[in-house]
Amino acid sequence: MIKGCGCSDGLTDRTRYEEVVLDTMLYSAQLKERVARQNSAVIVAMARMIAGTFEDGGKVLLCGNGGSAADAQHLATELTIRYRSSVERPALPAIALSTDTSALTAGANDLGYDAVFARLVEAYGREGDILLGLSTSGNSQSVINALDFARQQGMKTLALLGGNGGLMKGLADLELIVPHSGSADRVQECHITIGHVLIDLVERMLGYCRL
């Protein structure tokens, strides 16, 4: 049985809950606005890199842990299957490296978890491809190792980070750091929005919808 906090749920409590809703959603919106105003040029540059890679016959690999793994899978699916139903286009080659549980568990067991994504980059990545790493802290060693390996393979690298960028700051060719620390949730909300904007821009740059 799940027990509540034991507090009453009168009008005052409901008002406080509503304040939580407002505070949370308004802060999230303000953080996104700040990120957009400070990083619009970086987002456009990332989109150009992705669009150019697709034009050259390359692909995008994505990796992250936990909620960032879910974001990687979310964005890879929208590239390969569809982003908006109003845009008709062919599939765009993108692979989230967190989807194969057999590969993840074998890699964790045989190589150590920190080596898992780098091993998958070795398997799927080719010179000229892109690796997009997501980390709300910037300190995910498995993503750091994957970015390092990708660069050694001649791949281009992108990073969506949070806080102060952590250990991943400066590792990627292009990076965007969401300036929020202490919790992953607000950073993840920005990351998925940035991902959606990237896909929108890529579709426009490739001529599948109008600018």
From Swiss-Prot:
Residue stretches making up the SIS domain: 50-211
Residues binding Zn(2+): 74, 78, 188, 196
InterPro entries assigned to the protein according to its UniProt record, in alphabetical order: GmhA/DiaA, Phosphoheptose_Isoase, SIS_dom, SIS_dom_sf, SIS_GmhA/DiaA_subfam
Keyword Protease: no
GO cellular component terms given for this protein: cytoplasm
Primary localization class, coarse: cytoplasm
Residues reported in the UniProt entry to bind substrate: 65-67, 78, 109-110, 135-137, 140, 188
Catalysis performed (reactions): 2 D-sedoheptulose 7-phosphate = D-glycero-alpha-D-manno-heptose 7-phosphate + D-glycero-beta-D-manno-heptose 7-phosphate
Molecular function GO labels: carbohydrate derivative binding; D-sedoheptulose 7-phosphate isomerase activity; zinc ion binding
Subcellular localization: Cytoplasm
Pathway named in the protein's UniProt entry: Carbohydrate biosynthesis; D-glycero-D-manno-heptose 7-phosphate biosynthesis; D-glycero-alpha-D-manno-heptose 7-phosphate and D-glycero-beta-D-manno-heptose 7-phosphate from sedoheptulose 7-phosphate: step 1/1
Pfam families: SIS_2
Cofactor info, note text: Binds 1 zinc ion per subunit.
Job of this protein: Catalyzes the isomerization of sedoheptulose 7-phosphate in D-glycero-D-manno-heptose 7-phosphate.
Other known facts: The reaction produces a racemic mixture of D-glycero-alpha-D-manno-heptose 7-phosphate and D-glycero-beta-D-manno-heptose 7-phosphate.
Protein name per its UniProtKB record: Phosphoheptose isomerase
